[in-house]
From Swiss-Prot:
It is found in: Membrane. The lineage of its organism: Eukaryota, Fungi, Dikarya, Ascomycota, Pezizomycotina. It is a single-pass membrane protein. It comes from Penicillium ochrochloron. Cytochrome P450 monooxygenase; part of the gene cluster that mediates the biosynthesis of the indole diterpenes penitrems. The geranylgeranyl diphosphate (GGPP) synthase ptmG catalyzes the first step in penitrem biosynthesis via conversion of farnesyl pyrophosphate and isopentyl pyrophosphate into geranylgeranyl pyrophosphate (GGPP). Condensation of indole-3-glycerol phosphate with GGPP by the prenyl transferase ptmC then forms 3-geranylgeranylindole (3-GGI). One of its GO terms (biological process) is mycotoxin biosynthetic process. This is Cytochrome P450 monooxygenase ptmU. GO terms for molecular function: heme binding; iron ion binding; monooxygenase activity; oxidoreductase activity, acting on paired donors, with incorporation or reduction of molecular oxygen.
Length: 507
């Protein structure tokens, strides 16, 4: 027998042994029922995935009715172990749960064009550290630039026309949030660069759609397939364009620093780019990919909440005048200081109520298990499992709040008077009853900035414009576990005379 034939025989034998071991090995998750498994006559999981995409909420309720600890769902990505919410406190900060691997795997972070989902290349710990140690303590310093940019964007997007005219709420919200975020993270020139704003808005949408197309192919073929899909080529082009823009920003900043040094003057830039370098402490991170990663996790989520609040206020116009009165009082007294953001309490309550009734996800604690976990009641979660947690409130709003299925803009401002729940009342507060910003150690570190950004945007919008719904009532869109504010419904707006000047209000 030749050496080549020997290699083929040996390789085939090893492959056969591996296949037998895999086929006959007991499934460590077999004790947990699969709620949307294949039905008789279904050879593949295609229909199971469709049922998940269209009926996820009812499947979660069915799972809860069949077990009191855990069950499995076939999702569009994988078979997922869904855990009862009673384990939330036990697992929320568990050292054997990884929160970066699931999105990286779901969105193919190892493929070119999907690098913003690659946690090694983006190093999200650098961004989280920058937000926690630099940006959040400096919230008071970003108020005026955010206000000035909001004034500029709204004049462009909504115009100064005193006549009623229609706008698409989602598109307007995306433009506003993208520009405001870029204003703080990259400066006044980049935030008005149409190419960069287009990347911030469009890359995420394109990545989500392309990921769905890739899931139709066997995973072992993706390294080849992605080179030929036009949408993958578009993603690679956007990443390359983003690198070019950020490279120019870094070069200009270096020139500014050298000039300031030669002139013995300090640079007047709000230096989030320098903050990132400081927090990296010499470690690797890619500035362009990090900024794109920020767009993925922040731009669409904040714009979605802003859109939902606008819709909710149009459906509850009785809130508009009290909100305007609060804004006038607070900004007159505090300007755009940190105290102002805190004292916009009714606006805070309205934001939190909108997030409560229409979160981005109806599950929480989406994690990858890095080592076997045995829970206090003996429930075993094997290493290598992907898990998620039931969010009781998303399935039944009345489970945690009185009249929880009804919108009440005053709900959380009234809860501030209830001692045992007062710590849960702010928009940035996280609890087991309200996981819009996550829960535990991995709660969104940027929520304080997001709250500031959204409040300033709404202050301008409410004082400068009248709002009203048309004949079409907005409907949230569902896709699997996801909920998105209506991307199609338009509202009517017209310019009104604001009671006070807002753009450059100082404390």
């Amino acid at each position: 027998m030749s050496d080549v034939n020997a290699w083929w025989v040996g390789g085939s034998l090893l492959l056969g042994i591996w296949a037998i071991v895999v086929f006959f090995s007991p499934d460590p998750l077999a004790q947990y029922p699969v709620i949307n498994s294949k039905r008789p006559g279904e050879l593949f999981y295609t229909q199971s995935k469709i049922r998940f995409i269209t009926q996820a909420r009812s499947l979660l309720k069915e799972g809860l009715s069949k077990t009191n600890n855990a069950f499995r769902l076939v999702t569009n990505n994988r078979i997922l172990l869904v855990l009862h919410s009673k384990y939330r406190n036990e697992l929320r900060d568990h050292k054997s749960l990884n929160n970066t691997k699931p999105p990286e795997d779901d969105f193919f972070g190892w493929l070119q064009g999907f690098e913003p989902f690659n946690h090694v290349k983006t190093n999200p710990k650098v961004f989280a550290a920058m937000v926690r140690t630099k940006l959040t303590p400096s919230i008071g310093a970003v108020g005026i630039p955010l206000s000035e940019e909001t004034d500029f964007v709204l004049q462009q997007q909504l115009t100064d026309s005193p006549e009623w005219h229609q706008i698409n709420v989602k598109e307007t919200s995306l433009q506003l949030v993208a520009r405001l975020s870029a204003r703080i993270f990259l400066g006044p020139q980049v935030c008005r660069n149409p190419a960069w704003i287009g990347i911030m808005i469009n890359y995420t949408v394109e990545a989500f759609m392309t990921a769905e197309r890739l899931r139709m192919w066997p995973r072992w073929l993706l390294w080849l397939v992605h080179w030929f899909l036009p949408s993958c080529k578009k993603l690679r082009s956007q990443v390359q364009e983003a690198r070019g823009i950020i490279s120019q920003v870094l070069q200009q900043r270096e020139r500014n620093r050298k000039r300031a040094f030669l002139e013995t003057e300090a640079s007047d830039e709000v230096d989030t780019v320098q903050w990132l370098e400081d927090c990296a402490k010499g470690g690797y991170y890619d500035p362009a990919l990090l900024q794109m990663g920020l767009a993925v996790v922040a731009t669409h989520t904040s714009a979605d909440l802003l859109s939902q609040v606008i819709f909710d206020l149009c459906e509850h116009p009785e809130l508009l005048q009290p909100l305007r009165e609060e804004i006038v009082t607070v900004i007159t007294q505090h300007g755009w200081s940190k105290n102002a953001i805190y004292n916009l309490k009714l606006l805070d309550s309205v934001l939190k109520e909108s997030q409560r009734l229409k979160p981005m996800q109806i599950i929480s604690l989406y994690r990858y298990v890095t080592a076997d976990i045995t829970l206090s009641d003996g429930t075993l979660i094997p290493k290598g499992t992907y898990i998620a947690m039931i969010d009781d409130h998303s399935l039944d709003p009345n489970s945690s709040y009185t009249n929880g299925d009804r919108y009440d803009g005053y709900r959380f401002i009234n809860m501030r008077e209830v001692p045992e729940r007062s710590h849960q009342t702010q928009l940035v507060s996280v609890s087991s009853d309200h996981t819009g910003f996550g829960f535990g150690n991995h709660a969104c570190p940027g929520r304080f900035f997001a709250a500031t950004e959204l409040k300033i945007a709404l202050c301008h919008l409410l004082l400068k414009y009248d709002l009203k719904l048309g004949d079409q009532k907005p409907q949230a869109m569902t896709y699997g576990f996801g909920l998105s504010s209506d991307p199609f419904t338009q509202i009517s707006v017209r310019r009104r005379q604001e009671e006070i000047s807002l753009a450059g209000s100082k404390s």
